[in-house]
Structure formats: C-alpha cells, structure tokens
C-alpha cells in the first residue's frame, strides 16, 4: 500500500453496466373500477400520494369522463380524498391535471387530507 491515497485505482465491483429501470405498475381494471363510481362521478384518492397515485387518478378520471352519457358530459367529477399526503411533485401533477380538465372537479375530504393531500383538496375547481 502506498502512502498516496489518490494514486490507487478503485476496485471494480461489477463487470455489468448499471441499468436503470422504472417499474411500471400493471393496469388492473378491477382495481380501477373499485376506485370509481361512474354513476355518481366519484373518484377516490385513498392512501399515500406517489407517482403511481398520479397515474391512477388520471386513469380513473378518464374512465369516468369516457363512460358518461352526453347529458352528463359537463357534470363535475367528485374527488374524494382520504390521505396522509406524500410526494409533493405527484400532488402538483394531480393539481395540474384537475385544473386542465374540461369538467369541474369537486374535492371532498373524507377522513383526512394532510400535506400533499391538503394541496389537492384546496385545488378543487368545482362548487
């Protein structure tokens, strides 16, 4: 071992290159259907807010909007929130989505809406 610490080569730990994979959750139609009520225009946001929650809310809102009759096309979506919060970036994504929908979104707190959940609760665009 030499006295100069900077002259030594670092040990190689692996011969394979580092791969970055983004895990994509499988789309489970039964799970999506359990989180919405098309007749009442209800979408449920229950649990922690993360990147999967963002995708989940977008899919659920699209399902509600796409399965409405033409008479109910402009009725508001009711987003029911029960969350301790979570990722602020995902919450901001949900807020951007809500603000850019063609229909109003009523936000309803059932239980708790803390942290990122409170941001989403305050962002409702309905009555």
Task: Annotate each PLM feature.
Residues 1-127:
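Terminal-region recognition feature
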């Amino acid at each position: 071992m030499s006295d100069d610490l900077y002259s030594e080569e670092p040990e190689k730990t692996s011969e394979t290159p580092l791969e970055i994979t983004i895990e994509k959750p499988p789309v489970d139609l039964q799970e999506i259907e359990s989180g919405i009520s098309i007749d009442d225009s209800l979408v449920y946001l229950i649990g922690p807010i993360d990147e999967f929650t963002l995708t989940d809310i977008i899919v659920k809102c699209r399902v509600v909007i796409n399965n409405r009759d033409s008479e109910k096309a402009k009725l508001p979506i009711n987003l029911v929130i029960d969350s301790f919060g979570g990722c602020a970036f995902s919450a901001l994504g949900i807020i951007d989505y809500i603000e850019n929908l063609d229909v109003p979104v009523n936000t309803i707190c059932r239980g708790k809406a803390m942290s990122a959940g409170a941001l989403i609760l305050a962002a409702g665009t309905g009555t």
